[in-house]
Regions:
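N-terminal core-binding DNA-recognition domain of tyrosine recombinases/integrases
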Residues: 41-55, 64-110
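N-terminal DNA-binding module of tyrosine recombinases/phage integrases
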Residues: 1-52, 58
């Protein structure tokens, strides 16, 4: 298979193999998204890892990535060209009106 990685499943839990495999896929997706996001968010990633279910974590990370992409593509709130280049100060300068505009943007495109 081309570039697909094959993992060897060594399931020592009482969970079915398909569940363990799905959890591994979710965690891999989470790690991939985390690498795309700014480094100043690492503390939040650690919080998510220990306090929410993996699927919830994936949903949160996907939403954060979507918001960061919005900041770059649709606003002048950051000079970053890549999500990982967004600065903490860019987030500090976001105002309530900016969030309301984002929410309106989401309503139009969901």
């Amino acid at each position: 298979m081309g570039g697909d990685k094959s993992i060897k499943l060594n399931n020592k839990s009482d969970k079915p193999d398909n569940i363990v495999l799905k959890e591994h896929e979710i965690l891999s997706k989470c790690e991939g998204i985390q690498h795309e996001l700014p480094n100043f968010m690492r503390g939040f990633f650690a919080y998510l890892r220990g306090n929410v279910l993996p699927m919830t974590r994936l949903a949160y990370l996907s939403d954060i990535k979507f918001f960061c992409r919005y900041l770059i593509d649709e606003t002048e709130l950051t000079d970053a060209e890549n999500i990982s280049d967004i600065k903490l100060n860019d987030f500090n300068n976001i105002k309530a009106v900016d969030i309301n505009i984002f929410l309106d943007y989401c309503r139009r495109y969901t």
